[in-house]
């Protein structure tokens, strides 16, 4: 029963960072910066494991490089993803390692040389791996110690890596993979205020060159894409919690070979997240977001439903 109570206390705090990585290839990096994840730096006992499965839908406009004769493009994608995360300790500090995989299926329509076109795509997107470490806040704790620990301010850092593992055909203009590496360093702060957590993150995506861009021999380069996030989340006595989310991103100009650079992206998004415990070890998360303003850049509406299961490592048996 003590373990079950500890898990109940973890559920409103910890979360698996699930990624709809399939979108990254479609929007040239904009979807990466549009993601919003409240409580990404929450603490958890040493040896806590999380697995999550999610389904979702994303629909919105896609921005292409000016060298490509494609305009007024809209994508409607259904997504399925699975993720695993595990807490760890380093020099007495708490951290979290996670990995996520996504599959996408949907339709993309737009005008090619001013002629309406519609295509379908299905396959794996680029995977993602993330490692975070809390530099300020609670140190490593056992489940029993965690259950008694007060809430504290947390400051942490993380690195997300996206390798080119998704479906990619250089002779296709639209792909689910990106055929390049992406790296996102981030700093985060989480402050408890009464029943609330106030979170703020700052990050930037950096990209390698896609040297097999359409029609297969072009080189596509993209400048760093900066992003800031803010979240305000409240925990109820039932351990359910609700979050109000916001993000802004900017930058990410891209060029193909020596062609004209794309416009600098700039967009703001708002969203909401609800997490509901259904048993001591399981919870359901519902999230949605929409673009509030987008001077330039891809603009999406997203909806997500995720299931999460939590468990602890089995403690070593006592020696007789």
Predicted features, each with a name:
Residues 29-52, 137-153, 312-320:
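Outer-membrane beta-barrel biogenesis signature
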Residues 58-79, 117, 170-177:
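Surface-exposed strand-loop-strand hairpins of Gram-negative outer-membrane beta-barrel proteins
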Residues 107, 212, 217-320:
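Outer membrane beta-barrel transmembrane domains
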Residues 105-221, 262-263:
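Outer-membrane pore/translocation modules
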Residues 47, 74-80, 122-129, 153, ...:
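Residues that define the transmembrane beta-barrel architecture of outer-membrane proteins
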Residues 53-55, 82-86, 129-135, 159, ...:
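Residues on the lipid-exposed face of transmembrane beta-strands in outer-membrane beta-barrel proteins
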Residues 49, 61-62, 92-95, 138-139, ...:
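Repeated loop/turn-to-beta-strand initiation elements of outer-membrane beta-barrel proteins
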Residues 51-59, 97-105, 157-163, 200-206, ...:
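Transmembrane beta-barrel strands of outer-membrane/channel proteins
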């Amino acid at each position: 029963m003590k373990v079950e109570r500890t898990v109940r206390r973890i559920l409103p705090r910890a979360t698996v960072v699930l990624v709809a990585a399939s979108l990254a290839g479609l929007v040239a990096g904009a979807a990466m910066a549009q993601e919003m994840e409240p409580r990404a730096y929450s603490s958890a006992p040493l040896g806590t494991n999380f697995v999550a499965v999610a389904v979702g839908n994303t629909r919105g406009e896609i921005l292409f490089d000016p060298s490509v004769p494609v305009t007024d493009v809209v994508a409607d994608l259904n997504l399925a993803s699975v993720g695993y995360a595990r807490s760890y300790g380093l020099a007495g500090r708490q951290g979290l390692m996670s990995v996520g995989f996504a599959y996408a299926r949907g339709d993309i329509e737009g005008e090619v040389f001013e002629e309406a076109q519609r295509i379908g795509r299905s396959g794996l997107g680029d995977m993602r791996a993330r490692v975070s470490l809390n530099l300020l806040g609670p140190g490593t704790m056992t489940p029993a110690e965690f259950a008694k620990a007060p809430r504290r301010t947390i400051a942490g850092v993380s690195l997300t890596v996206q390798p080119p593992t998704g479906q990619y055909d250089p002779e296709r203009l639209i792909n689910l993979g990106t055929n390049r590496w992406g790296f996102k360093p981030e700093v985060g702060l989480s402050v408890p205020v009464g029943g609330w957590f106030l979170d703020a993150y700052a990050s930037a995506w950096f990209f390698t060159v896609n040297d097999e861009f359409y029609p297969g021999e072009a080189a596509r380069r993209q400048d760093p894409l900066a992003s800031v996030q803010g979240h305000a989340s409240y925990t109820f006595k039932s351990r359910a919690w609700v979050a109000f989310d916001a993000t802004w991103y900017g930058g990410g100009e891209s060029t193909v070979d020596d062609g004209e650079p794309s416009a600098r992206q700039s967009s703001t998004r708002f969203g909401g997240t609800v997490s509901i415990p259904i048993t001591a070890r399981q919870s359901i998360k519902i999230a949605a977001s929409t673009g509030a303003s987008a001077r330039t850049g891809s603009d999406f509406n997203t909806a997500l439903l995720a299931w999460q299961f939590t468990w602890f490592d089995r403690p070593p048996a006592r020696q007789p």
